[in-house]
């Protein structure tokens, strides 16, 4: 007899507990879709709790929120790489939203640095946004052009916020979050991680 047992992820076990399979016995496909969606929600909730729990415990909540919101503001339309494993995603999130704010929290920046940095970010948005993934190909040239335009407008808005905000250290944190998003859409990042770039080409 084999002693090998398959280790079921915690999120999957929790989803099984929360969803009654008996209610979906006549719709296996529907059950799997709902279960998968619930797993994604649970994974994100747990990741959020870990990142913000550590941030709160270390007194970095404001810094974490600043970096995270800047990152999400640009990511909304420019998309970009996702980690393929939950553990990797959590570790990367801790590095980006807890460790990086800790390192950069006391480094001030002036508006000339802001302008230079965001000029670089805007160029990357023009060249590379939006960037898709294997699991989320961005199909349709018109759709991609719309996303690119919105990503560039979002970059300009964030530039204005960074220029107007009176706290020099906050300017730095906004730029850090924005640069993380630039890394996630850059073709070099895809190449280094051996991920496929321009996944939409497979469907068009």
Swiss-Prot record:
Its EC number is 3.4.-.-. The keyword Iron-sulfur does not apply. It is found in: Cell membrane. GO terms for biological process: proteolysis; quorum sensing. Belongs to the AgrB family. May be involved in the proteolytic processing of a quorum sensing system signal molecule precursor. Keywords: Cell membrane, Hydrolase, Membrane, Protease, Quorum sensing, Transmembrane, Transmembrane helix. It is an enzyme of class 3 (hydrolase). The chain crosses the membrane at residues 40-60, 87-107, 111-131, 156-176. It is a multi-pass membrane protein. GO terms for cellular component: plasma membrane. The keyword Phosphoprotein does not apply. This is Putative AgrB-like protein. It comes from Listeria welshimeri serovar 6b (strain ATCC 35897 / DSM 20650 / CCUG 15529 / CIP 8149 / NCTC 11857 / SLCC 5334 / V8). GO terms for molecular function: peptidase activity. Pfam families: AgrB. Its main location: membrane.
């Amino acid at each position: 007899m084999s002693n090998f047992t398959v280790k079921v992820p915690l999120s999957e076990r929790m989803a099984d507990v929360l969803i009654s399979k008996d209610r979906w016995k006549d719709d296996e496909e529907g059950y799997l879709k709902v279960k998968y969606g619930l797993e994604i929600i649970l994974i994100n909730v747990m990741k959020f709790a870990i990142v913000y729990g550590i941030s709160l415990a270390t007194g970095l909540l404001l810094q974490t929120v600043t970096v995270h919101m800047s990152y999400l503001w640009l990511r909304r339309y420019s998309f970009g790489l996702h980690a393929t494993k939950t553990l990797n995603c959590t570790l990367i999130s801790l590095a980006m939203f807890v460790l990086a704010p800790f390192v950069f929290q006391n480094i001030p920046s002036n508006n000339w640095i802001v302008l230079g940095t965001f000029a670089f970010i805007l160029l990357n948005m023009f060249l590379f946004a939006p960037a898709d993934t294997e699991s989320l190909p961005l199909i349709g040239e018109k759709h991609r052009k719309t996303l690119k335009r919105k990503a560039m407008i979002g970059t300009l808005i964030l530039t204005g916020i960074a220029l107007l905000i009176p706290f020099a250290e906050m300017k730095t944190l906004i730029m850090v979050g924005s640069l993380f998003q630039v890394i996630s859409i850059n073709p070099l990042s895809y190449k280094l991680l051996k991920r496929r770039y321009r996944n939409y080409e497979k469907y068009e």
